[in-house]
Amino acid sequence: MAIWIVWLKKPVKISRSVRCARSGFHRAHSARYIFVTGICLMLTVSSAHAQELPHASPVPGGIAILPLVPDTEPAPVVHFAGQRIMVMRHDGRWQAVVGLPLTLAPGPQTVTARDSEGKTRDYPFAVQSKEYAVQRLTLKDKRMVEPTAEDLARITREQSIIQQAFAAWTEEALPSLRCLLPVHGSVSSVFGLRRFFNNEPRQPHSGIDIAASVGTPIVAPLAGSVIQTGEYFFNGKTVFLDHGQGLVSMFNHLSRVAVERGARVSQGQKIGEVGMSGRVTGPHLHWTVSLNNSRVDPVLFLPEKNNH
């Protein structure tokens, strides 16, 4: 079964029943702030033989998937840009699943693999260029654009906690990286947007936003461990899940956190509820996916992706 979604000027409703929707859509504070043309995406309901790895997209903010040779046991240890890299077995061989930072320059790159005997091998690959759209938002709370000195001190403390969560590494890997959509709602802001708040440039959008009513349940897209919860200046009430081998997801702006640090959650288990905490223009869930400490597009973890 296929579902066609074409961008008009309104957000689209996406059901969790089709797993995570591959979306190139964005509704900023108002749809007039961003203009997208020529986008048409097809979502295909996954079959029993669906791809277990994320979709390869070797662009800044994307994912490179590199087959490794020789096929030895145990799995080789792989590094890229000083970070340990996820290695999964797929199609009968080891594959390096590499998260590419949004700040990465297009061009040649290399990962290095080391086998159990200490022998190393380099795997070159190319990062393609990608231009992300611009988003302009207007915030009524000026502190969210120009924080006070006290706010800045708090933000600095919180950034240390957030970075520590994103740097988490556990050896255990999930057998499948196919996601569930964390919440029923409308994709209102896509990944990678170059953001301006009240005409002031800010960091690119490091996840996707899903607009939904306050109190709408949020579920774990994959099984994992709760490695951090808290309430942060910009992010509001937040949950971090560690899914193994450098794959970490973050859920922001909650009204309620339904899990405790240290808990193990299954795929589809409720972890919180949609809210308006932190820096927001309306109720929504901000969902970030981090792979080897690089923020990557969450839609690459969806069952199928076809661009037209």
Task: Cite the ranges covered by each PLM segment.
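Bacterial N-terminal signal peptides
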Residues: Y33-T44
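Tryptophan (W) side chains
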Residues: W4-W7
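Cationic-aromatic interfacial patches
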Residues: H49-P124, S129-E131
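Catalytic cores of peptidoglycan-degrading enzymes
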Residues: L180-H308
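Surface-exposed, glycine-biased beta-strand/turn segments
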Residues: L53, P124-N235
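Short, low-complexity intrinsically disordered segments enriched in A/P/G/S/L with frequent Arg
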Residues: P11, S15-A31
